[in-house]
Amino acid sequence: DFVSGHIDLARKTGAEIVYGPTASPAFDCIIAEDNQEFKVGDLTLRLLHTPGHTPESSCYLLIDAEGKETAIFTGDTLFLGDVGRPDLAIKSDLTQEDLAGMLYNSLRTRIMPLADDIMVYPAHGAGSACGKNMSSDTQDLLGNQKRTNYALRADMTKEEFIKEVTTGILPPPAYFPLNAAMNKNGYDSIDEVIARGTKALTVDEFKSEIANGALILDVRTQAEFIQGFIPNSLFIGLNGQFAMWVGALITDIKQRIVLIAPEGKEEETVTRLARVGYDYTVGYLKGGVSSWDGELNTITSISADELAATENCTIVDVRKPGEWQSEHVENAMHYPLDYMNDDLTKLDKNTTYHVHCAGGYRSVIAISLLMQQGYKNLIDVAGGYGAIKNTD
């Protein structure tokens, strides 16, 4: 789900890239064998081939100078509280059920037999779309995971595992397979991407890029955005789950992008875009919106109390399906932000909509997206559902 940077790192350090068995990248690397060991000073890393998330998935067991197995880096095979999803293999002839069965075997033959005092370091935590129920912790003892992780139940059959792991998986963001292909086939140097993307543009240069098809991406806070933004801008603030929403909503990974960014955050923005494969940022507006010589749009925002006092309003909830199913405002429309690009036929451009999410970040993204499509009668509910449910 990210461009890993391994090619740049290998080029700059001289280190070799190591892949698990069956991998077929388009560049020089080591295709390791199961149980192959690599020395790092006095330490040893042993590759454990653990197919399931993908056919080549592998974990790395850390062995100290005395020969004690002390930690395991589990990648997307084992998370804290969850396991890797089995539906992301690129161009595989295996079904997700096939891969889930392989994952069951890998967990039970390669990881669960290890000692309980081994520390687990997974590749992702809460908020990632790579699993369904990940913990926000970053490390845990393997023994704790054996006791608490639903997918490591000692009495779990393979059939039960396959059903539970494959049930309720939401479609992956569209950029996932594109990132995987870039990791396999190569990508532009990050230095080149940053140099291209951090060019300070004059207003005229900025307008020229827009005229040639560039997307305006505004990465300020939602509070700053609603007070004034360049028409047709897409808001995705750096202060939220930036990479995930970029990947979900900017459907063309080669889209040319121009930025409205807080001063000093331009390089960070370009870098974070590149991490999910968006390498075609071509500059930022020098001076930001204060230097813009045209009109600025604004978004009306009301409090949850003001919403409660509004009669006959049409509410649009843009939270995820699980959030909606847990609780929602009676008679609200449900339009998950994740899928808003897919179908807007239920929304009428002549109707006024009060838009909310959980806390106020996603609702502003949604409103900016709808305004790009010609919707104008949109009101943001500040504080989102968190504020709504606390009103009298």
Language-model features, listed with the residues they occupy:
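Hydrophobic "anchor" residues on beta-strands that sit immediately upstream
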Residues: 72, 214, 313
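Metallo-beta-lactamase
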Residues: 44, 54-170
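Short, well-ordered beta-to-alpha junction loops that form the rim of enzyme active sites
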Residues: 122-127, 132-133, 178-181, 218-221, ...
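Active-site neighborhood of phospho(di)ester-bond hydrolases with catalytic His/Asp-centered motifs
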Residues: 1, 17-22, 49-52, 72-75, ...
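Rhodanese-like catalytic fold shared by cysteine-dependent sulfurtransferases
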Residues: 85-87, 93, 144-181, 185, ...
